[in-house]
UniProtKB/Swiss-Prot annotation:
UniProt xrefs under InterPro entries: Ribosomal_uS14, Ribosomal_uS14_bac/plastid, Ribosomal_uS14_CS
Keywords: Ribonucleoprotein, Ribosomal protein, RNA-binding, rRNA-binding
GO MF entries: rRNA binding; structural constituent of ribosome
GO biological process: translation
Protein name: Small ribosomal subunit protein uS14
One Pfam family per UniProt: Ribosomal_S14
Family that this chain belongs to: Belongs to the universal ribosomal protein uS14 family.
Length: 99
């Protein structure tokens, strides 16, 4: 189990990313446009946005345990929880492979 503070930090980052998404996109467009003076000013504003508002800093975590590695996107849980839940029949439509 991940620490509660790590889970909370990830939730906080997700909120920041959502809050600043439009502003970041607009500033990035200006920076990449061409006019050097305008681009410089936009870059300064972009640097003033919090670091955690950058979507690159988001990391997928298991919804049940908070585990950051072995995450299965389709189900939103870690491989360990997926295996356990699938074995117990808790995930509809998932069964053990046999060939």
């Amino acid at each position: 189990m991940a620490k509660e503070s790590m889970k909370a930090r990830e939730v906080k980052r997700a909120k920041l990313v959502a809050k600043y998404a439009e502003k970041r996109a607009a500033l990035k467009k200006i920076v990449n446009s061409g006019d050097p003076a305008e681009a410089f000013e936009a870059a300064q504003k972009l640097q003033a946005i919090p670091k955690n508002a950058n979507p690159i800093r988001l990391h997928n975590r298991c919804k049940l345990t908070g585990r950051p590695k072995g995450y299965i996107r389709q189900f939103g849980i870690s491989r360990i929880q997926f295996r356990e839940m699938a074995s117990n029949g808790l995930i509809p439509g998932v069964k053990k492979a046999s060939w």
